[in-house]
């Protein structure tokens, strides 16, 4: 079976979300080479994320962060039997098409890389491969799900080893869902209209440049071939589903700042479906032990006595950064 045949089998929304459910309850680790990928697999990771650099090094290097080199991704794909994911820049359709043709298992449209489109994220429904996207709140999550994301994650603040932003994003999302469940359908439609406003940014900017009022026609496309009203209706449908379920309709992982087994357990205690670990493994003093400990912490998140043993003799975690001292906030990228 060729790679394109495999992609074809991933195509429907049901299959895309089904693939995401396969990694539920697990840990996905960032890796930059075959050796790291094998360490992750041996530690029990359910998947790996192939990058050129881990987020801490991306932050340190500065400049423009792009999709990892194809040779690097292929090296990682050849090294492990677990699923391999890879990141593309926000809005970069060409990078996504390349990864789809390469045959990775999932694409992360990621704020960790330098965004390529200041207005829009990729319309993920145009692809057969599943996507995961980050969110800071319910609005961002609903927009990404409407665009076709099969899996969500918190943005956190990648590369810092500081869990505070991931906690913030989980709390904002959960409390907004709780509020949604107390709202009438009419009120929820108003929320959908509010959440759809970012799709108007380009149209409004063009009108401002042209000296025209910031208004769009009822039948005017504002995102691909979708009108503002069509977007509102789509978001409204997802919001009603969230109200009914009491959670997002897709798998939702924690990401951004997970650096210790305790961090991973905290995210699971807060109701997340699993954990992404970026720099926290390979910026620690003993990556194999830290990797295994974080996997075990996710498996035993509600067993404090077990967590005590898991947290022993695992070496030093990565050096963390105070969020208030950051010059660049990766979480603010995207809309």
From Swiss-Prot:
Tagged with keyword Metal-binding: no
GO biological process, one term: pyridoxal phosphate biosynthetic process
Coiled coil: none
Binding, D-ribose 5-phosphate: 30, 159, 257, 278-279
Family: Belongs to the PdxS/SNZ family.
Subunit field text: In the presence of PdxT, forms a dodecamer of heterodimers.
NCBIfam families: PRK04180.1, pyridoxal 5'-phosphate synthase lyase subunit PdxS
Function: Catalyzes the formation of pyridoxal 5'-phosphate from ribose 5-phosphate (RBP), glyceraldehyde 3-phosphate (G3P) and ammonia. The ammonia is provided by the PdxT subunit. Can also use ribulose 5-phosphate and dihydroxyacetone phosphate as substrates, resulting from enzyme-catalyzed isomerization of RBP and G3P, respectively.
Name this polypeptide is given: Pyridoxal 5'-phosphate synthase subunit PdxS
Gene behind this protein: pdxS
